């Protein structure tokens, strides 16, 4: 019996025409990294039997509202979960900084997306214990941070993952490491599998 209850919507980072979305030396491009990770994820998820869609597959930026409309318009009987993949930055892309780590954003308030993001957060932290994980509250009780980012505000559950800082030299090296990128994909898959099981047991019955 197919217990794939999720429709995964992959949302790549900003297009190649958005300025500042790269490392200060220009050797790392967020739009390329994100699209490559999304392609790997889509292939693995398809093999596992998931329904997979993209908000955009082009290199240029379609606009945040168009991304949201694309996700809103996907017809499915499954529970829609949008995952937006980005790299973080402490500046505008012109200088190196020391800020580091991982953040996950969801829409404001207590929602089902918070539960899903906490599950993903826990999986990533388990698989990458040496990384700094940034909490949404000073007491570390809230894993995700709240934001009214356009892509988080549709008719679906959603999380935006800021994976490492593209203006931190050490983390840029990690973003270029194929082994680390593959491990990141595998960790995301495990997180999605856990979320899917939760949806199957609690939301689809």
Stretch-by-stretch model annotation:
Residues 7-11, 51-56, 79-85, 103-106, ...:
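Structural recognition of the beta-strand scaffold that forms the well-ordered cores
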Residues 112-141:
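Active-site-adjacent substrate-binding region
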Residues 17-29, 89-119, 123:
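A short, glycine/acidic-enriched catalytic loop
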Residues 15-17, 58-62, 87-93, 109-112, ...:
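Solvent-exposed loop/turn segments at secondary-structure junctions
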Residues 9, 22, 28, 84, ...:
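Active-site-adjacent mobile loop/cap segments within catalytic or ligand-binding domains
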Residues 38, 42, 65-68, 113-121, ...:
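Extracytoplasmic/secreted envelope proteins and their assembly/folding machinery
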Residues 64-79, 148-154:
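Mature extracellular/periplasmic domains of secretome proteins
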């Amino acid at each position: 019996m197919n217990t794939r209850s999720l429709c995964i919507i992959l949302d790549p980072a900003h297009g190649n025409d958005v300025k500042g979305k790269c490392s200060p030396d220009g050797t790392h491009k967020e739009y390329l990294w994100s699209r490559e990770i999304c392609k790997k994820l889509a292939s693995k998820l398809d093999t596992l039997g998931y329904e997979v869609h993209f908000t955009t597959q082009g290199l240029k930026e379609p606009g945040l509202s168009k991304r949201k409309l694309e996700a809103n318009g996907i017809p499915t009987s499954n529970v829609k979960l949008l995952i937006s993949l980005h790299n973080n930055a402490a500046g505008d892309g012109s200088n190196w900084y020391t800020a580091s780590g991982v953040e996950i954003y969801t829409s404001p308030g207590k929602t089902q997306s918070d539960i899903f993001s906490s599950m993903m957060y826990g999986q990533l932290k388990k698989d990458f214990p040496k990384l700094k994980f940034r909490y949404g509250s000073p007491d570390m009780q809230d894993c995700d941070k709240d934001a009214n980012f356009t892509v988080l505000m549709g008719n679906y559950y959603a999380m935006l993952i800021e994976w490492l800082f593209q203006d931190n030299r050490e983390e840029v090296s990690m973003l270029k490491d194929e082994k680390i990128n593959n491990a990141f994909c595998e960790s995301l898959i495990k997180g999605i599998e856990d979320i899917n099981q939760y949806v199957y047991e609690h939301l689809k019955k």
